[in-house]
């Protein structure tokens, strides 16, 4: 008795097209309608793994890690230089959920850059900022501004060590006027020194010392006087 074989079912044409359109693994350039394109690895139709994304309108280029369609891991972002037109690196570091997160270096200009911690694409944690005028800030950051304990070293060598809040000197701190050989220690509010003591400090090595040294003034209880003045100031601030 002859045995009949069932004909093998062929794949529907639309299923074949859909299967071939699915992006998985390494792919060459995949273009978007607006001209943006991506070269790299895919998983389940989204960018995942190593890859390079180019944004046509801005000229921005990201090279690095991707997870489920977002920049995640280590990567470098480059933008066109407004003067030369050539791409220059503006950020190298870690990303999470398409935002700068973890340790990274951000270049704001040829002589101005930040190296340190990031959270949600904002400077947050510990970091060091090199300003174009030669000043350097090193310390804690929050919401893209110095906040917490930190030191600002000015180009001329003078420096402030102490508390910061919202990008300004706020709280207890010391300012070393090394150019004049003096040290101020006291309390600041929004970059203004409100109360404290000034003494000579390194006056013999100062390039421009004051004409006369600060005379020694003896108070029976200098710490108590300063504490009382500080308490009065804080009370006034609370009343306002």
UniProtKB/Swiss-Prot annotation:
Coiled coil: none
Disulfide bonds: none
Gene3D superfamilies: Histone H3 K4-specific methyltransferase SET7/9 N-terminal domain
Main subcellular location: cytoplasm
Localization (cell): Cytoplasmic vesicle, Secretory vesicle, Acrosome
Keywords on record: Cytoplasmic vesicle, Repeat
Region Interaction with SIRT1: start-end pairs: 76-100
Purpose: Assembles a suppression complex (suppresome) by tethering SIRT1 and MDM2 to regulate composite modifications of p53/TP53. Confers both deacetylation-mediated functional inactivation, by SIRT1, and ubiquitination-dependent degradation, by MDM2, of p53/TP53, promoting a proliferative and cell survival behaviors. May play a role in the regulation of spermatogenesis.
Protein name, per record: MORN repeat-containing protein 3
Organism: Homo sapiens (Human)
The encoding gene: MORN3
């Amino acid at each position: 008795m002859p045995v009949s074989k069932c004909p093998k079912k062929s794949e529907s044409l639309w299923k074949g097209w859909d299967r071939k359109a699915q992006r998985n693994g390494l792919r060459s350039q995949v273009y978007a309608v607006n001209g943006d394109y991506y070269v790299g690895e895919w998983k389940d139709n989204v960018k995942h793994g190593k890859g390079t994304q180019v944004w046509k309108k801005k000229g921005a280029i990201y090279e690095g890690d991707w997870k489920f369609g977002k920049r995640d891991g280590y990567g470098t972002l480059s933008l066109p230089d407004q003067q030369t037109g050539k791409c220059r690196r503006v950020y190298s570091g870690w990303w999470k959920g398409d935002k700068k997160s973890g340790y990274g270096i951000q270049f704001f200009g040829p002589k101005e850059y930040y190296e340190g911690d990031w959270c949600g694409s904002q400077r947050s944690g510990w970091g060091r900022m090199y300003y174009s005028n030669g000043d350097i800030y090193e310390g804690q950051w929050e919401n893209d501004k110095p906040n917490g304990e930190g030191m600002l070293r000015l180009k001329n060598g003078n420096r402030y060590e102490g508390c910061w809040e919202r990008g300004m000197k706020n709280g207890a701190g010391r300012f070393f006027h090394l150019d004049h050989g003096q040290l101020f220690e006291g309390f600041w509010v929004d970059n203004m020194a409100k109360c404290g003591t000034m003494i000579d400090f390194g006056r013999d090595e100062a390039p421009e010392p004051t004409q006369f040294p600060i005379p020694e003034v003896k108070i029976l209880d200098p710490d108590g006087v300063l504490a009382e003045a500080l308490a009065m100031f804080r009370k006034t601030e609370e009343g306002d």
